[in-house]
Design a protein with these regions (language model features):
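Conserved core of the sugar-phosphate nucleotidyltransferase
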Residues: 1-89
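Conserved alpha/beta core of the MobA/IspD/sugar-nucleotide pyrophosphorylase nucleotidyltransferase superfamily
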Residues: 63-140
Length: 140
């Protein structure tokens, strides 16, 4: 799998790997779409429901013209030892604020590596997304 290949490519082996995809301009301000802020080496610096980074002195409708925005697919590949300690880590204030479980690892100092995939997956986290999924299922 792509996640297993990423574990083998990286040295040192990260705690977690997860796929990201390039966001379209119409989705960067949607709080139901989780955004990922990436370092130059592909490490996830932060995950948020807000558009990150914020582009100062530019109308938000034009932010996508100044930087790339990355969406989080929501699948993970974990190093074995990380799975065993996950529930022992203290609850994270950022995790509670954003309602994003991966922030617990970020705040605890663990590395989350990313790799780019084409397209996106369908998330069903809101009533609106459930309706969209029902429409897509009916069209299939």
């Amino acid at each position: 799998s792509a996640m297993a290949a990423e574990f083998g490519r990286l040295d040192p082996v990260p705690a977690v790997v997860t796929p990201v995809y390039r966001l379209k301009s119409e989705t960067i301000h949607n709080p139901a779409v989780v955004k990922t802020l990436l370092a130059h080496d592909g490490r996830a610096l932060y995950f948020s429901r807000s558009a990150i980074p914020h582009v100062r002195d530019v109308d938000p409708s034009e932010w996508h013209q100044h930087t790339s925005y990355w969406g989080h697919v929501g699948m993970y590949g974990f190093r074995g030892d990380v799975l065993t300690i996950w529930d022992q880590l203290p609850a994270s204030p950022l995790e509670d604020l954003e309602r994003l479980e991966q922030l617990r690892l970020i705040e605890a100092g663990y590395t989350i590596a990313t790799f780019v995939v084409e397209g996106t997956s369908l998330s069903v986290d809101t009533p609106e997304q459930l309706e969209e999924a029902r429409l897509l299922a009916g069209a299939a």
